[in-house]
Structures are given as C-alpha cells and as structure tokens.
A protein has these predicted regions:
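Conserved catalytic/switch belt of AAA+ P-loop NTPases
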Residues: 302-352
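C-terminal alpha-helical "lid" subdomain
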Residues: 373, 377-434
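Walker A/P-loop nucleotide-binding motif
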Residues: 234-253
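N-terminal pre-Walker A segment at the start of P-loop NTPase domains
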Residues: 200-228
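AAA+/P-loop NTPase substrate/partner-engagement loops
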Residues: 259-292, 299-304
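Interdomain "pre-motor" coupling segment immediately N-terminal to P-loop NTPase/helicase cores
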Residues: 133-199
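Intrinsically disordered, low-complexity N-terminal extensions of AAA+/P-loop NTPases
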Residues: 1-157
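Conserved AAA+ ATPase "SRH/arginine-finger" region at the nucleotide-binding site
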Residues: 349-364, 371-385
C-alpha cells in the first residue's frame, strides 16, 4: 500500500495526519517486517477508529473503506479537480499524469487486507468493509453529503478498470464540484486567532421548502424569479427581505438554497461583526463554479456602528468589479436597516460632524443598494387561521378547523401575537399534547 500511495502525483500532497498517509506508513512497517506486533495493531486500530469517526459524522454505511476513499477524492481540491469542476475532463497532458493516480485508487479500492489481518490476528478491515451503521436521525449528520458519498462509492466499486474509475470521478466533479463547496449547501465563517477565517459547513440546515411556507405567494415568486435568473447566469439583484418578526423571511432564504442547490447555489452566512472579511470572502469564492448567496440575517445597524461601510463598499464595488457569481441576500426587521434618531434629524446637535446630513444620507441610502426589496408583513387574522389549519393538516392533526382556530386565537394572545412563527409553535404544541 505504501509504495502505491507514494506514487500519487496530483492527489499525493497528503497531510501527515491524513488517515491514508498514516495507514501507508503502517503498512510499510508491515511489508518490510520492521514492527512490534502489539504496537502495530494498536496504531492500525487507531486509524480504523478514525475511519469510524468519519463514518459517524457523515452517515456512511456498508463498505467504510470505500466510503472513506470516495470522500477523500470528493474533497481533494487540486488543479485537476477544480478544472473538472468547471469544464469536465478535457483532453490534455494532465489527463496522462492523473491516469496513474486513478490506477492507484482503483488498486486501493480493490486492496486485499487478508494477509495483514491474518499475520496480525485482526479483522478490523473485514468488519468495516461490511458495516451496518446504527440508524440515526438525518439532523445528526449531513444527509446530503452521506447520500452523495455512498452513491459515488457504489459506482466506483462497479468500475471495471481505471478508465471507468476516472470517468466516474470526473463526471462527479463536473456535476457537483469538488471539496466542501461541492458537497455542502451552506457555510458559516469561523474566525481564527491570527485574524484569518475559514468556511465551516452547516451540517444541520433545515430541509424546508418554499411550499412549507404558507401564504406569501407574491413574496416567494419575487424571490424565486430573482434567484432563478441568478443560477441561470442572467442578471440578478441583491435582495433585502424586510418586515415583521416571525413572518418567514429567514425560512424563505433557506428554502431557496434547498431548491436551487442542485443548480449550483450555495449560501455563506455572515454576521455583522464579520463584515471586515467580506472582501477576502469574495476573493476566495469568485473563481469557483458555483453561485453564492452571502446571507445576512436580522441585519440592522445602531447609530454608533460603522460596519455598514464594509457592506456598502462591497455592494457598490470599487476598482474591482463585483463577481457575477455572488449576490447578497439580507433579512431585517427595519425597512431602512439603520435606526434613525432624533439627533439624526437635527444637524445642530452634531457639532462634531460638520457633514452630518451627508452621514445620515449615507446610512439611509444603504437600502437603495439592494435592487430587490420584499416586504413580509404580519398576516391578517384570517390568513393566520389559514396558516394554522394548513400546518395542522400537514402534521396529521385531527381537530376540526373551528377547534383549531379557537385554540390558536387563545395561543397567539399570550405568545407574541399573530405570525407564521406563532402558528408553527401552536401546531407543534397541539401535536405534542394530543
């Protein structure tokens, strides 16, 4: 195994803590006969346990060795895989260089572990090659990643030779992409102590769809039309969803990402204090073969906050043109995003800012930088009752409409008033207690 792994070229830049790298070293010890049996068994078990940990995190099943190798190939970002993400496996010299890598991975897929298991008196590789995982709820792992890894793994198992193996992997790159952006729908920003950041996949995003949001048909269509144009490569606008709390603004964004994920749409959630990274975030994703929504939830600015300047600079663009594959979608309870105080209306009270009127105008004009603004208002009582009854029927509730509306009316009076969120909470309560 070690000799094969050491010949990898495009996929050979393995971190020293990578499972494949560690196993290669351990198998080299076994092959040359320089090992302590107890220590070697312990070290092999450590790496097998790591494979089990990955399998648990991502919901792998059946042949975990194949699942792990498949996951490794899917996550390997290199010049070849990123090019395939954009244009597929085009003819060129690089194909010849990569062909040997895929020949090696085909051998690793077909690797016979019996000699080492027999010599060391272990069966861990046999066990993980025919593994039956405990059934888990989807929210305990990334169901989307699990499905893709297991499906691709089955195709690679069936590959007759390295050419078919090559075709299957490169076909996946072209269809879905490579690395974390290829496998995941949504990300958040994780800040580092050194001032840098990284993208962290959101593994348990709600699997909500637009049809799950009752009502708001005009708003949903407006959002869908803009997003559909965006994923089709047409001109589209930044979007601001504003209005009352609990009316479905954030739900609409999540549903849009779920709906257009297969069309290459990805979402990056960013908080206000992270706006300083906006330029670097854009630089990191602008050349990838995806459409990115930079998502800002519950966006608003107080009088003393200046983070809006970072956002405004990105939206307006400076010397560098904003990439066509990036849009900003934001939700807010404030129509103008920024709280306007009485002092904002009175220049005389702001002697420290000789151009205070310009400052106020700069703040309030931020909303105009969003080409599409969509209003989400609280539903009327009739609309509220309609939301309640539809949600109840979808949940299998057997109470009559009259009973539901009567109890919903009592509920909303003590739970924040009429809204889609209140309706959902009420139905959850009813289903839990009936």
């Amino acid at each position: 195994m070690y000799q094969e792994i050491s010949k990898l070229l495009m996929y050979g830049d393995l971190p020293q803590d990578e499972i494949l790298y560690k196993l290669g070293q351990l198998f080299e010890q076994f092959e040359v006969g320089e090992y302590n049996k107890t220590e070697l068994v312990r070290d092999i078990n450590t790496q097998v346990k790591r494979i089990l940990n990955v399998a648990t995190d991502y919901g792998f099943d059946d042949n975990l060795w194949h699942n792990y190798l498949t996951f490794f190939l899917m996550m390997s970002e290199n010049p070849f895989s990123i090019t395939c993400e954009k244009v597929g496996a085009s003819d060129g010299s690089v194909n010849g260089l990569v062909a040997n890598d895929f020949r090696i991975f085909k051998k690793l897929f077909d690797y016979d572990f019996k000699p080492i298991e027999s010599a060391l008196g272990i069966d861990c590789f046999t066990q993980i090659s025919n593994y039956k995982a405990i059934v888990k709820k989807d929210l305990m792992y990334n169901h989307n990643v699990s499905e893709k890894v297991r499906a691709l793994s089955k195709k690679l198992e069936a590959a007759k030779d390295e050419q078919e193996f090559f075709d299957v992997v490169t076909g996946f790159y072209k269809a879905y992409g490579v690395g974390m952006f290829g496998l995941n729908k949504a990300f958040r920003i994780e800040e580092h102590l050194d001032g840098g950041f990284s993208f962290m996949p959101i593994n348990n995003m709600d699997a909500v769809m637009l049809d799950d949001l009752i009502g708001y048909e005009i708003q949903k269509k407006k959002l869908t039309d803009n997003t559909e144009a965006f994923v089709q490569g047409k001109k589209a606008n930044n979007v601001l969803l504003f209005g009352d709390s609990g009316t479905g603004k954030s739900t609409s964004i999540k549903a849009i990402v779920n709906q257009y994920y297969d069309d290459g749409l990805r979402m990056i959630e960013i908080y206000k204090h992270q706006f300083k990274y906006l330029s670097k975030i854009i630089a990191a994703i602008k050349n990838r073969n995806y459409r990115f929504i930079i998502y800002m939830d519950d966006l608003s600015f107080e009088e003393h906050e200046i983070e809006y300047k970072f956002l405004k600079a990105v939206i307006e663009g400076g010397v560098e043109t904003k990439p066509d594959n990036i849009l900003i979608y934001a939700t807010s309870n404030r129509r103008h995003l920024i709280k306007e105080t009485w002092n904002d209306r009175n220049d005389q009270d702001n002697s420290n800012d000789k151009h205070h009127s310009d400052t106020v105008e700069e703040k309030l004009s931020l909303v105009n930088r969003f080409g599409v603004t969509i209003s989400y208002s609280k539903p009327s009582q009739k609309e509220f009752f309609n939301i309640v009854t539809e949600l109840a029927r979808k949940s299998g509730c057997t109470l009559s409409d009259e009973e539901l509306c009567r109890e919903a009316n009592k509920w909303e009076l003590s739970h924040g008033g009429i809204s889609g969120r209140t309706a959902t909470q009420f139905v959850n309560y009813i289903m839990a207690n009936n």
